[in-house]
């Protein structure tokens, strides 16, 4: 089984994947690690090509009967169109989405928890307005494409059973 965990920046994708790794011993790939590897190796033009590479990695995991989680911001909302039925039967997708109300009332906590798993070098670009815009857009895209999502509106209690 492959689990795709999507969502805007700061929604807790990596933290969720880390918790699921610890609970189920299922490995995960952070798309940010792949992206940073490309950037640091001077291959910045390749960052736009992440989804085709990830898609083929997912197919390989399914073909080999391996469990894998892939988390990050670069999973397209029309991801299903990249796979035939025999693959889709083994892939789950969830997008983490924070409501405007949650962001408004918990922005300080969101910023505080930004480094729970990964150490961000510069988080100054994270603004309340940006988070609201990104999460609102993601919710609209999830609804338009019929994607499963977890709406974070009250207490932050994101969990998935594999």
Language-model region placement:
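Conserved beta-strand scaffold positions in the cores of enzyme catalytic domains, especially
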Residues: 26-28, 91-95, 149-151
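NTP-dependent small-molecule kinase module
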Residues: 136-162
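A glycine- and Lys/Arg-enriched "phosphate-lid" helix/loop adjacent to the NTP-binding pocket
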Residues: 91-137, 141
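Conserved substrate/cofactor phosphate-moiety recognition/catalytic segment
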Residues: 15-64
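Hydrophobic anchor at the beta1->P-loop junction of P-loop NTPases
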Residues: 5
């Amino acid at each position: 089984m492959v689990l795709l965990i999507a969502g805007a920046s700061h929604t807790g994708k990596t933290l969720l994947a880390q918790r699921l790794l610890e609970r189920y011993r299922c490995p995960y790939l952070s798309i940010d690690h792949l992206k940073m590897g490309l950037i640091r190796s001077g291959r910045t033009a390749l960052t736009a090509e992440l989804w085709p590479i990830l898609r083929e990695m997912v197919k390989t995991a399914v073909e080999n009967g391996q469990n894998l989680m892939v988390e990050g911001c670069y999973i397209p909302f029309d991801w299903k169109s990249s796979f035939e039925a025999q693959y889709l039967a083994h892939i789950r997708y969830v997008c983490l989405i924070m409501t405007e109300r949650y962001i408004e009332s918990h922005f300080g906590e969101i910023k505080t928890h930004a480094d729970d798993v990964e150490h961000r070098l510069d988080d100054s670009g994270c603004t309340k307005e940006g988070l609201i815009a990104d999460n609102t857009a993601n919710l609209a895209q999830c609804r338009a494409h019929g994607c499963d999502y977890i709406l974070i509106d009250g207490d932050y209690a994101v969990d998935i059973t594999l």
